Amino acid sequence: SIGAHASFLDKKNFGRTIISWDRLLIHQLLKDQINFMKDMTKECDISTTHFKPHGALNYLASRDEDLAFEIVKFLKINHPELIMLAPALSKLAKVSEIEGIPTALEVYADRTYEDDATLTPRNIKGSLITDPEKSISHIQNIIHKGSIISRSGLLLPTKIHSICLHSDTPNSVEISKQICILLNSMSISQSKLIDLI
């Protein structure tokens, strides 16, 4: 599946800098970035199937219901055919589902979680999982228990449609290979989001 992965206009820090926002800013950046992706995929004769906020935009939308609503409202009005790919148990996922947007729930192979199901901030030691064995154990536990597992050990039940792994995480290639091996060993097949939602 190919999706539009929109972020704040922060090229220097790869969209990971939190920026003050308002409705006009959010709608403009979503318009520009989603349309750019759709134009590019159209030229290649393929479809854009989903939308996912990136970096700080995703981080904030997971916690801020007002921001989540602005994103969902824009998608619902302008791109209702797109699946919303949202962090499992996030405010964004909740608002998207309430508003009737097709919603896929995602967990992270290379990030730890807090008790409220949000990602541990990157400035906290250990928030980024770079060891392949630890990452695979992390994902295996999530799948087996059907829950996000916080750093304190709290189980947070959720459905899971997608596993995210950041390409700039150290050892990401090896982690990706091992995730594929794990899923195959559990008889979990890889599918397009449009076939799941």
Task: Walk through the language-model features, giving the residues of each.
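Active-site rim beta-loop-alpha module in soluble metabolic enzymes
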Residues: 89-147
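Glycine/small-residue-rich loop that forms an oxyanion/phosphate-binding "nest" at active or ligand-binding sites
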Residues: 11-53
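Hydrophobic faces of well-ordered beta-strands that scaffold small-molecule active sites
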Residues: 2-6, 49-53, 84-86, 103-107, ...
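C-terminal domain-boundary segment and adjacent tail
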Residues: 82, 174-197
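Charged helix-capping and loop-helix junction motifs
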Residues: 64-70
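Catalytic beta/alpha-barrel core
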Residues: 60, 79-88
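Glycine-rich tight-turn/loop motif centered on a GG-T
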Residues: 12-27, 61, 118-130
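Flexible, glycine/charged-enriched surface loops at secondary-structure junctions
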Residues: 41-49, 147-159, 189-196
